[in-house]
A protein has these predicted regions:
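Cleavable N-terminal export/targeting peptides
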Residues: 1-25, 166-167
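Short glycine/proline- and aromatic-enriched beta-strand/turn motifs that initiate or cap beta-hairpins
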Residues: 20-64, 68-74, 93-94, 101-104, ...
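Solvent-exposed loop/turn segments connecting transmembrane beta-strands
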Residues: 39-45, 77-83, 96, 114-122, ...
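Residues that act as N-cap/strand-start positions at coil-to-secondary-structure junctions
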Residues: 48-50, 85-87, 124
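Outer-membrane beta-barrel porins/channels
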Residues: 83-90, 151, 160-161
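Short, contiguous, well-ordered secondary-structure segments
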Residues: 84-105, 146
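Mid-chain, well-packed structural core segment of small domains
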Residues: 101-115, 119-123
Length: 167
């Protein structure tokens, strides 16, 4: 038990040092997407989805991203009574061009599907995206995510704000 606690304290100290490094490497975003949930009879159901993202660029090409989202087939119930909710923690590998950036995402997600689809699961999430920068700090964002081998997928358009700019 003592060894476990000392390992946890050491890892927390290392992570806190990285997190304290630079606020300029933080970014956040929001988006609206068309989500698709796989129904047990083999068909797909299209859902409107709202999502929010927070991320930290650790290096120029490596970052960590957390995304949460909520989806429903009725626009009035996306936040109040969603059919699907998800939370994902992903590693982000990115490459920046002049005014654009492309990236790959991969990680773990928790997916809750309700209202007779009855699927609550944790699994892998993979995706890719592109940022088109209008100025130094704000980007138009397009990305696609695939949860748990196709159980749920999203194609998102939104924005991302980079505190330190994209350079």
């Amino acid at each position: 038990m003592r060894r476990l606690l000392s390992c946890l304290v050491l890892s927390l100290g290392l992570l806190a040092g990285t997190a304290h490094a630079d606020v300029a490497k933080l970014y956040f975003g929001a988006g609206f997407s068309d989500g698709s949930v796989d129904i047990t009879n083999g068909s797909d159901k299209s859902l409107g989805t709202l999502s929010a993202t927070v991320g930290l660029q650790l290096l120029d090409f490596v970052g960590v991203e957390v995304e949460v989202g909520s989806a429903s087939d009725q626009s009035g119930s996306i936040l109040s009574d969603p059919l699907v909710t998800y939370q994902a923690v992903m590693l982000r590998l990115s490459y920046r061009l002049d005014r654009a950036g492309v990236y790959l995402l991969g990680g773990q997600a928790r997916l809750d599907i309700d209202d007779q689809f009855n699927n609550s699961d944790a699994g892998n999430v993979f995706g890719f995206g592109i940022n088109l920068f209008g100025n130094e700090t704000t980007a138009l964002n397009f990305h696609v995510l695939d949860f748990d081998d196709g159980a749920f997928s999203t194609a998102t358009i939104g924005f991302q704000y980079y505190f330190g700019g994209f350079r």
